[in-house]
Each structure stands twice: as C-alpha cells, then as structure tokens.
C-alpha cells in the first residue's frame, strides 16, 4: 500500500468571466431575456454560478442560489421600464469565486404614440398645383424607423401598411436613419402619382397612417 498521496491546492478564482444580454442588445421590449455567459478557464467541470441584479427573485447576491454553470441562461427582468443590470459570479469546484461580471440593457415595453398635424388638404389629383398633400408628425419617444402608407382600417398594424413611394416626388414617407428624437417634427409630402401607385391605381378615399418603431423594436399601433 502507498504511504503517500497527492493533494492539489487551488486558490485561483475563475478567470475571464463575462456576460451579455440578448447578444449585447441595448434595448428590449420583453422582460424575458437570454444571457450568454463565458469563462476563459479551460475546464469548467464542477463549476457553478449565481445570477442577480435586475432579476425577478434575485435582487441581491444573497438572494440568488448557486446553480450549475452554463453558457446560456434565460432570465426574467424585474418590472418597470428603464436600465436593467444583471450580475454573474462563477464559482469553481473548490468554491473559489470570480469577481462579478455585469451587463446592462434598457427595458422599454411601451408602445410609441404618433401625433399627426394636418394634412393641409384632404383631396389631391395628379395635376401640378393640386397634386400635393402635406402634414407633420411627431412621436412620444425616440424612434429608429418610420413609414407612411395606406392601410385598410384605422386600427391596422404596420404589417398591413402599403408604404407610399417617392418616385413622383413624395418626401419623408419612410426612414431608417435611427435615433430620431421624440421632439422631431417630420414634414411629409404625398404626391398624387405616388399615392395612386400605393392605392393600386384606383381613385377613392384611403386611410393614410404613420408608424414608428422605437429603439426596443416595438412599432406604434
């Protein structure tokens, strides 16, 4: 029988711990998000982790429970729109703990509201001098994209919108430059020939609606 044995001392905490929320997204409209967790240690056998912060049921580190280390984890953010911070601590098999890694994301569950002023005229033709209708619109929050088009009903969603083109001279019927301020007053001009194309070529009265998409990816109703 052997009269000796090997005993390993390991006091090194897990290295290179990092976390991303929804692949590094800045905004989310959904409280349920996906975490991507990483650790640079070559072998993570026996590792565990704690997740806390703006997390339902785990506001503080002591509220969180140790669970088996995983590179992916779905969590639910706490109620209330605003900046959310999630922390992750990784512990090795002999309970050396890493420093907390963190990531942030802004929760925005609100639906943008669009306000239209105008139009200056409610009937147009294709004849110069009578072929243009102008209006202005604003949104109640910062938005990244907008579109103006014909919809079948007043309560139609953006997926039903036939965007009015700009071939005939219409302007500001769509945009995707991003970060449009909520205070920005956008003037849109609809030209008769473009309106006719969007309408399928037939005369008649049509519903024109403006949609904006906020930075969380939610379109106005």
Residue ranges, per PLM feature:
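Low-complexity, disordered linker/stalk regions enriched in Pro/Thr/Ser/Gly
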Residues: 1-221
């Amino acid at each position: 029988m052997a009269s000796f044995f090997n005993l390993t001392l390991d006091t090194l905490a897990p290295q290179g711990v990092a976390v991303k929320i929804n692949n590094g997204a800045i905004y989310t409209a959904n409280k349920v998000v996906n975490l991507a967790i990483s650790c640079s240690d070559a072998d993570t056998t026996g590792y565990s982790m704690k997740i806390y912060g703006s997390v339902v049921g785990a506001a503080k580190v002591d509220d969180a429970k140790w669970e088996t280390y995983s590179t992916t984890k779905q969590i639910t953010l706490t109620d209330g729109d605003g900046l959310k911070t999630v922390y992750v601590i990784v512990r090795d098999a002999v309970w050396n703990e890493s420093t907390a890694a963190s990531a942030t994301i802004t929760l925005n569950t609100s639906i943008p509201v669009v306000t239209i002023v105008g139009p200056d005229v409610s009937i147009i033709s294709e004849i110069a001098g009578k072929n243009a209708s102008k209006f202005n619109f604003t949104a109640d929050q910062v938005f990244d994209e907008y579109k103006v088009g014909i919809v079948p009903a007043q309560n139609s969603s953006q997926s039903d919108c036939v965007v009015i083109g700009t071939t005939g001279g219409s302007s500001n019927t769509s945009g995707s430059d991003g970060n449009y301020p909520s205070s920005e007053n956008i003037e849109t001009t609809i030209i008769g020939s473009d309106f006719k194309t969007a309408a399928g070529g037939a005369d008649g009265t049509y519903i024109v609606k403006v949609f904006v998409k906020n930075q969380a990816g939610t379109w106005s109703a």
